[in-house]
From Swiss-Prot:
One Gene Ontology biological process: translation
Organism: Macrococcus caseolyticus (strain JCSC5402) (Macrococcoides caseolyticum)
UniProt keyword Metal-binding, yes or no: yes
Annotated gene: rpsZ
Protein name (database record): Small ribosomal subunit protein uS14
Disulfide bonds, paired cysteine numbers: none
Subunit structure: Part of the 30S ribosomal subunit. Contacts proteins S3 and S10.
Length: 61
């Protein structure tokens, strides 16, 4: 889990647009966030396996 102070810092309006970054809405992780779902890869995988994300299913070939 991310520190509450870091989450609060990220949510503030940044002075420059390039300083803004995405964070997982579920756990607060700043890296490997899938923008469409606003989730990190770990949370995305957990929710996809449980079937809680509509339209997403495990790939098999």
């Amino acid at each position: 889990m991310a520190k509450k102070s870091m989450i609060a810092k990220q949510q503030r309006k940044q002075k420059f647009k390039v300083q803004e970054y995405t964070r997982c809405e579920r756990c607060g992780r700043p890296h490997s966030v899938i923008r469409k779902f606003k989730l990190c890869r770990i949370c995305f995988r957990e929710l996809a396996y449980k079937g809680q994300i509509p339209g997403v299913k495990k790939a098999s070939w």
